[in-house]
């Protein structure tokens, strides 16, 4: 082992330990190492001496020269008494220098480039097998455009073929719905399936993130153009690019569905006469209500007005939601009893319509009495040409004052 050559700690584990206080042992060890080194130099045919070895020594040339002089004077390769001063100057040899970053020779002898050459500097000559890394994020590239470009690149592989397809379909459907909701404010594709043209002032790639200086129509056209270019050929057929036609719903008449196990419920109408009423033959002259005309063509089987109390006009009062009708200017108001006038105002029936409904109700009562049939609330609803709820209130009011008793109609039998 050389004097100044470092050695790993693992190789020194089996050696004898030398204490720091035993200075004579240190000198003896140094003399042995120098003697072995001189013997090797003498046996070398090249004739190297300590001065040649000192070129690789970490210490100065003057230190090596002094060692050579002492060894030559003694002749036996041992140090003289001046070794103490030498050891005092350099007690412990310093470790070798660490490799520099600029060194171009590695431990295995293969050439390599220094780190300072690859970082922040340009090599002077042509260097092979060197990878230069440059930034790949161009100016103006946003996150959304980068995501679109990445999806478009990955969709070229079969494993990522469905990466951009559902996302693009959703965008197309959303834009179509927005266009329909705006009442076709935006332009659609033509019959030849050509997308809307781009603005002439736009020189960059079409993107959903358009310039805020463009108007709303131009930004919409740019988004449609970008979707058309990026997704052309990814769909199964070209028909998916056709905007869906909006269905125009026309108001249809509701029809009643009848179950075979359920009897059909008949709903009376105020305008259509019923054919299953008993007085169908008596109303052939006035089957429908005609203002100020139909009530005069119907026979009057009503009880006399004298049967109503004269001191009160609330004998026919019923409950009805809604504000009453003002009949103070009606020309037929004198044909009604004051209690009947209050009833007509409450049910919001003009005087001629009230007289028409009154005569139809009692006409049905007489004809059913002739046939021996009872007169019920539903019979009154079928006979009158008014709302069924108002006809029920008329039946309730007339029954309260006793006008529906059979004794009032025995003279017509």
UniProtKB/Swiss-Prot annotation:
Family annotation (InterPro entries) = Homeodomain-like_sf (IPR009057), SWIRM (IPR007526), WH-like_DNA-bd_sf (IPR036388)
PANTHER family tied to this protein = SWIRM DOMAIN-CONTAINING PROTEIN FUN19-RELATED (PTHR12374:SF21), TRANSCRIPTIONAL ADAPTOR 2 ADA2 -RELATED (PTHR12374)
* Gene Ontology BP term (one): chromatin remodeling
Skewed-composition ranges (Low complexity): 35-51, 200-211
Top-rank lineage group of the source organism: Eukaryota
Region called Disordered, residue ranges = 35-55, 189-211, 249-271
Which residues are annotated with the PTM Phosphoserine?
Answer: 207, 211
This chain belongs to the protein called: SWIRM domain-containing protein FUN19
Other facts noted in the record for this chain: FUN19 is a non-essential gene.
Which residues are annotated with the PTM Phosphothreonine?
194
Q: Name one Pfam family in it.
A: SWIRM
């Amino acid at each position: 082992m050389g004097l100044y050559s470092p050695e790993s700690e693992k190789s020194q584990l089996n050696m004898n330990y030398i204490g720091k206080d035993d200075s004579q042992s240190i000198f003896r060890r140094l003399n042995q190492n120098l003697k072995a080194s001189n013997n090797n130099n003498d046996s070398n045919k090249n004739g190297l001496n300590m001065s040649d070895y000192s070129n690789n020594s970490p210490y100065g040339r003057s230190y090596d020269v002094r060692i050579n002089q002492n060894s030559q004077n003694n002749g036996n390769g041992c140090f003289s008494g001046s070794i103490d001063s030498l050891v005092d100057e350099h007690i412990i040899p310093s470790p070798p220098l660490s490799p520099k970053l600029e060194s171009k020779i590695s431990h295995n002898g293969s050439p390599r480039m220094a780190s300072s050459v690859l970082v922040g500097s340009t090599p002077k000559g042509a260097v092979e097998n060197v990878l230069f890394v440059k930034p790949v994020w161009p100016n103006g590239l946003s996150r959304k455009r980068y995501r679109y470009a990445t999806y478009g690149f990955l969709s070229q592989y079969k494993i990522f073929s469905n990466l951009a397809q559902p996302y693009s379909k959703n965008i197309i459907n959303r834009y179509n719905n927005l266009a329909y909701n705006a009442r076709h404010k935006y332009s659609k594709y033509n019959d030849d399936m050509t997308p809307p043209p781009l603005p002439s002032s736009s020189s960059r790639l079409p993107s959903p993130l358009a310039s805020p200086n463009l108007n709303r129509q131009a930004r919409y056209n740019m988004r449609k153009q970008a979707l058309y270019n990026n997704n052309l050929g990814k769909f199964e057929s070209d028909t998916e690019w056709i905007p869906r036609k909006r269905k125009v719903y026309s108001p249809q008449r509701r029809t009643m569905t009848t179950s075979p196990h359920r009897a059909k419920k008949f709903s009376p109408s105020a305008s259509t006469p019923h054919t299953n009423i008993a007085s169908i033959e008596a109303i052939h002259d006035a089957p429908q209500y005609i203002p100020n005309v139909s009530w005069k063509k119907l026979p009057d089987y009503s009880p006399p007005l004298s049967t109503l109390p004269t001191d009160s006009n609330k004998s026919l009062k019923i409950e009805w939601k809604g504000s009453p009708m003002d009949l103070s200017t009606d020309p037929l108001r004198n044909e009604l009893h004051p209690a009947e006038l209050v009833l007509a105002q409450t049910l919001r029936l003009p005087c001629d319509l009230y007289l028409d409904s009154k005569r139809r109700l009692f006409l049905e009562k007489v004809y059913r009495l002739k046939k021996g049939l009872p007169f019920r609330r539903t019979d009154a609803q079928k006979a009158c040409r008014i709302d069924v709820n108002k006809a029920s209130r008329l039946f309730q009011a007339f029954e309260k004052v006793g006008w529906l008793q059979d004794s009032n109609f025995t003279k017509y039998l």
